């Protein structure tokens, strides 16, 4: 490995803690001296997890309430990223689900992009976003998104090497950007809590409260079946979801990792009704020995073993999830909780760091 290589880390925005931010944290552990460039930054992200890091923001940070309104700044993001001067760095490692792949590097520098997904609201989820948009946004979005699609493809061409977080996303990268990508599964903290063989009588869901996660399906299914459901997380749709929840639904809010793992360990099963690019939470659940009942599309097909560590439902409806819950209660899954945890070991944080380091050594340090 060459010495004196200057490395920069790049991330779309650093506001809430999710799977993408956990990837960024592993990048930081690999390159602790590297600054982190991001559009906007909330120092409370991850309970202050990044407060000792060298975090550098764009001019968007100066806009009042930027950490609340950043999602409405889509048309400003390309300019903000392109104005960053990264010419002093030999290697740029980006964690991208939006626009940060569009940073401009030195001609002889290497930009490795860990792509969580091609920009959702520009490509495959565009019509879902449009369907739920206000009248004004419905009027403005088509022309705006058309321009963003052109820029997004240009931005993808600036990347030297793509890494995808699943084979599912590698296919999307190929479709929208016409680029190949190597799959490296995201890091998952494999908990070491003692397993319980007799779980408590509740189902669990851990998620941000946004539409495409389809938490509404889980609530409707558990309402109709009168099953206990604990929901951990928060977000834009919280008011709507609370309004539809019946007496068997509990909202636990945002919890730290230790509190959350207690819920994973004791849950009867984990519900995963959304179509995700990868989906870290089902692996976290399996690391606690908890079976997963998942919508059978997207990344879940690569992390859950149907019939062994969980069950799939094939239609994204409350009725289909209800049938899956009833099937699980009638027949269970093949693996016991110890073997379910063993399956999760192939997604560990150490494995992730080793694979990322190998890529960096191959493309940037030779």
Predicted regions and their residues:
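Conserved acidic donor-binding segment of nucleotide-sugar-dependent glycosyltransferases
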Residues: 306-307, 311-318, 326-333
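Nucleotide-activated donor-binding/catalytic signature segment of Leloir-type glycosyltransferases, i.e.
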Residues: 239-261
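Short alpha-helical donor nucleotide-sugar binding micro-motif in glycosyltransferases
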Residues: 254, 262-267, 356
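Membrane-proximal helix-turn-helix segments that form the acceptor-binding/catalytic region
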Residues: 131-162, 170
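A charged, aromatic-enriched C-terminal amphipathic alpha-helix characteristic of glycosyltransferases
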Residues: 316-319, 332-361
